[in-house]
Design a protein with these regions (language model features):
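Active-site neighborhood of phospho(di)ester-bond hydrolases with catalytic His/Asp-centered motifs
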Residues: 35-38, 54-62, 91, 200-205, ...
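General small-molecule cofactor/ligand-binding pocket signal
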Residues: 6, 89, 113-118, 131-133, ...
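Conserved beta-strand hairpin/beta-sheet module of binuclear metal-dependent hydrolase folds
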Residues: 1-50, 83-85, 144-147, 154, ...
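Metal-dependent catalytic neighborhoods of phosphoester/phosphodiester hydrolases
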Residues: 69-77, 101, 268-277
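Binuclear metal-ion centers of metallo-dependent hydrolases, dominated by the metallo-beta-lactamase
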Residues: 119-120, 208-331, 337, 341, ...
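Active-site metal-binding motif and surrounding structural segment of the metallo-beta-lactamase
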Residues: 39-89, 113-116
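Active-site neighborhood of divalent metal-dependent phosphoester bond hydrolases
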Residues: 79-116, 266
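Active-site-proximal loop/helix segment associated with metal-binding centers of metalloenzymes
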Residues: 15-17, 126-214, 220-222
Length: 359
């Protein structure tokens, strides 16, 4: 089953010409989960993958850069005649916030469920769960989130099953689903249970133990990196993280890929990536519209697919939506580059990008 993270916005606190405010779209099979919804998120989605029918929205905390795009998106869903229910999850205080928004989005033709989570609450889904993680940030309540898949059955040994008298074909499938076939039990012919995939999204946070524990052996840790280490004192005062701190947490948690986001407008992104890679080499600094694809562990590591005008055109032709320009189509101090890429001249677009495997 496909699992990916699409980054609709990677800026920190305020948008820039090439970065939108925080929003991460997680796609797992047919499920669509949005984590945070900063101002302009729906337009970022329209410019890229389209305004999808979301299943759920998870808000990390109530600083405006993480939720201000939500009332407009709810209204747009109404104007598009959405009929499917939508659930919004968030920390304590979410009901009060949504009540205040109601004057903006008005009456909706679809059911809107508001669920306040307590620290360490879990939201069960089909084949996985989403867990709230209490993090350290200057907000009344702030969460990160972990998406954790259910364990998967081990591999079937077809030769052993056949020797025990099981006929190849549908009966093999029954064994894999946990059924006993002709007296043969699944545990007789199935290998060890395999772990599912894990994604962790920090939201805004200073380094904290709860996040490190939740991120243990995660396939992808999406961690904020608002500052470089030169601004460590400012990070401490505002309860944000430096790129080095994010990398130290990733190394301690033994994650497979660290993805840096929530980038201050003072940085291009490359300096954050380089600072983190000095501690934890498997690090990427994200740009708007990047996608991380997460295969099952036995099929390899997560890979980063950079957005490009070529990808935008191809997806627009396939989906019938207007093509969107790459968000970093011009040079400047806010335009990050892949490792080793030369800086683009003013007005020069980055070359079309192919999927890049993490180190």
């Amino acid at each position: 089953m496909d699992l990916s993270l699409f980054f609709a916005g990677t800026a920190g606190s305020v948008p820039s010409a090439r970065r939108g405010l925080p929003a991460v779209l997680v796609r797992r099979g047919g499920d669509r989960l949005l984590f945070d919804c900063g101002e302009g998120t729906q337009r970022q989605l329209l410019r890229s993958v389209g305004l999808l029918d979301l299943d759920s929205v998870f808000i990390t905390h109530f600083h405006a850069d993480h939720w201000l795009g939500l009332p407009g998106m709810l209204k747009s869903f109404a104007l598009r005649e959405r009929s499917e229910p939508l659930t919004v999850y968030g920390p304590p205080g979410l009901h009060e916030l949504m009540d205040a928004m109601r004057i903006i989005y008005g009456r909706l033709p679809y059911e809107l469920d508001i669920v306040e989570l307590a620290p360490t609450d879990t939201v069960p889904r089909d084949g996985y769960l989403v867990a709230a993680i209490p993090v350290r940030h200057k907000a009344n309540a702030a969460f990160g989130y972990a998406l954790v898949e259910d364990p998967r059955p081990g591999h079937l040994d077809p030769q052993l099953a056949a020797r025990l008298g099981v006929t190849p074909g549908p009966d093999f499938g029954r064994l894999q689903r946990g059924e006993t076939v002709d007296g043969v039990k699944p545990e007789q012919v199935m290998g060890p249970t395999r772990e599912g995939r894990k994604l962790v999204i920090s939201g805004d946070s200073a380094p904290c133990e709860a996040l490190a524990i939740a991120a243990h052996e995660a396939d992808v840790l999406v961690h904020e990196a608002t500052f470089t280490h030169e601004e460590a004192e400012r990070a401490r005062l505002t309860q944000h993280s430096t790129a080095r701190q994010a990398a130290e947490l990733a190394r301690a948690a033994d994650v497979r890929l660290l993805a840096l986001t929530h980038v201050s407008s003072r940085y291009a992104g490359g300096e954050l990536r380089d600072e983190a890679r000095a501690v934890f080499p498997a690090t990427e600094a994200l740009r708007d519209f990047d996608t991380i694809h997460v295969p099952f562990p036995e099929r390899g590591r997560a890979t980063l697919e950079r957005w490009s005008e070529r990808l935008s055109r191809e997806r627009a032709q396939a989906g019938g939506q207007d093509a969107a320009p790459a968000p970093d189509a011009s040079g400047g101090r806010d335009t990050p580059r892949a490792a080793g890429d030369p800086a683009p001249r003013s007005g020069e677009a980055h070359p079309a990008a192919e999927p890049v495997a993490s180190p």
